[in-house]
Amino acid sequence: MVAINYAALHAASWLINRINQVNVYFHAATDIITSAANSKNGWDVKFNGIPSYAVNMTDDLIRQLQHRPKASTEFINGAPNVTEGKLYEFGEGVGYRSSRCRSGFWPPGPGCPHSKTRHLVFPLAPEVDPIQRGSVPLGPIGLFVNGVAMYGFKDAFTYRNLATWERLAPEFERFDMDLCEGHADASGRYHHHHFSPCLSRQLEEDSSPDSAHAKIYGWVNDGFPLYGPHHGNKSLAISCWQKRDYSSSLTGCSDGQRSCIFNNNGDISLGTYSVPSLLMGPSTNDNLTSLSSNIIPAESGVFYQDFYFNSSCADQGGVYLNYHNGHSHDDFGFHYHITVDKELHPVFPYLIGPKFYGVVKSSDPVSMYSHQSRFQSL
């Protein structure tokens, strides 16, 4: 087994604000505030959660905004107020009608980003969990290298609130994300559930050779690193979690509906169990409604229970990832990968999961908060 110098990886990966860069819309410093390896508990990170993102308004982004299903009511003038070629700082308005985030940078969502001083300590000798008991929780599961919180794939809601069919945040919150594919929760903590093109640009992944292995995008609470989408050799890392075909005898249910759930979606040979009619999921031909009143097609892939792990896929090795959405190769040791398709659309489980590979002694180790500054409109 390759010995990994986690202290060296931490030292090289965090984006530290050494020039006191300030976001004028938050009146707060951006990215990591301080970072030090000399903590008795591990790698010590202090940050405020406000990234130094900037978005170049391209024609593609303008069309994306214009074609939002509720553009006529979401934007103050019925359309985005943007200029092609302009660089928009994180928080600078694009015309959204938002009662809470006054700048108009964010579509309607759970909350407005706040700047908060926060402190985390990551273990420098991560331990593999031999019994894989650490399920990915709601809320933070780690930290991206620019101080943005890393969240798992769930959105805290279930179909009809019956605690059976768990909704996936990247599906049901797809219209609640900003141009950097992030948003804030009700407490004001800005976070990503999946790949962020803005973080990729910040890490200068666009300029990396096609054959290069991705850089570290963040650190998971179990102490293992999360790398970007590329495995190397011009190839993406590939998730082996696959969507159920409800009409198939192998992965579906006898009636072709969401009437059964795998006993263990990590091992489909263990079969399924039928759910009572009250707990059946929607037909894959139905439409559902998000919290922001957008229509979400109920096709397979919008609930956690729509997925199963294909061990034969993972057994191929190389670019194919294990149950935890990670692998070990060359001199990297075990690491997770962000998963996307060729168009950089997020692919389940997006970051990690559904269980941590390593031992998590706390879901949010050594965390301290003090309110600094709420988003302000200048």
Where are these regions (language model features)?
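Extracellular-facing segments of soluble proteins and assemblies that are Gly/Ser/Thr-biased and enriched
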Residues: 132-224, 230-233
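Short loop/beta submotifs within extracellular cysteine-rich repeat domains
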Residues: 130, 198-203, 342-350
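Extended, compositionally biased non-globular segments
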Residues: 224, 229, 233-378
